[in-house]
Amino acid sequence: MSRIGNRILTIPAGVEVSVASDNTVTVKGSKGTLTQKFAEVITIKVEGAELSTTRANEIKHTKQLHGTTNSLLQGMLIGVSEGFKKTLDINGVGYRAALAGSKLNLSLGYSHPVEYTIPQGITVECPKPTQIIISGIDKQVVGQVAAEIRSYRRPEPYKGKGIKYSDEIIIRKEGKAAGK
């Protein structure tokens, strides 16, 4: 069984953590503020510069919530102090991205350009027409935006065309062999 829930998290300098009576945690830092409500069976304590979680019982579901809560809290602490970033690369002839205000215009080989509205709290940059950098303080939202943009044209295994994460490895396939 994983022991992730038993980790004691260190609160970075310049970050304030407050826990309300209904188990709502508010984390304030230099990048912004995040608030999230957690299950009542998990007790969250702030002691000095340390954040710890304890569970009320040993039921399997409570143990799962314990680890999840601890990981979400760590993500909140990192998000408000450093932030999160995902980079997408675009491969393909004529495939490109351009920023127009709060919208991202994508040319992905369809008969029409794809327009994506950027959600609040997310910053999108296009340093090159074939690169998209998504950043923000909420790990879940950054990942969700990156996944939604990638879903418009997933990389295909034959030529590698499409939108992929910069650290993603596309396993290539060989095309059909010509018969005699």
UniProtKB/Swiss-Prot annotation:
One Pfam family of this chain: Ribosomal_L6
Family indicated by similarity: Belongs to the universal ribosomal protein uL6 family.
This protein's GO CC annotations: cytosolic large ribosomal subunit
Molecular function per GO: rRNA binding; structural constituent of ribosome
InterPro entries linked to this entry: Ribosomal_uL6-like, Ribosomal_uL6-like_a/b-dom_sf, Ribosomal_uL6_a/b-dom, Ribosomal_uL6_bac-type, Ribosomal_uL6_CS
Function field: This protein binds to the 23S rRNA, and is important in its secondary structure. It is located near the subunit interface in the base of the L7/L12 stalk, and near the tRNA binding site of the peptidyltransferase center.
UniProt keyword terms in alphabetical order: Ribonucleoprotein, Ribosomal protein, RNA-binding, rRNA-binding
Gene3D superfamilies on file: Ribosomal protein L6, alpha-beta domain
Organism annotation: Mesoplasma florum (strain ATCC 33453 / NBRC 100688 / NCTC 11704 / L1) (Acholeplasma florum)
Subunit-structure text: Part of the 50S ribosomal subunit.
GO terms under biological process: cytoplasmic translation
Name of the protein this chain belongs to: Large ribosomal subunit protein uL6
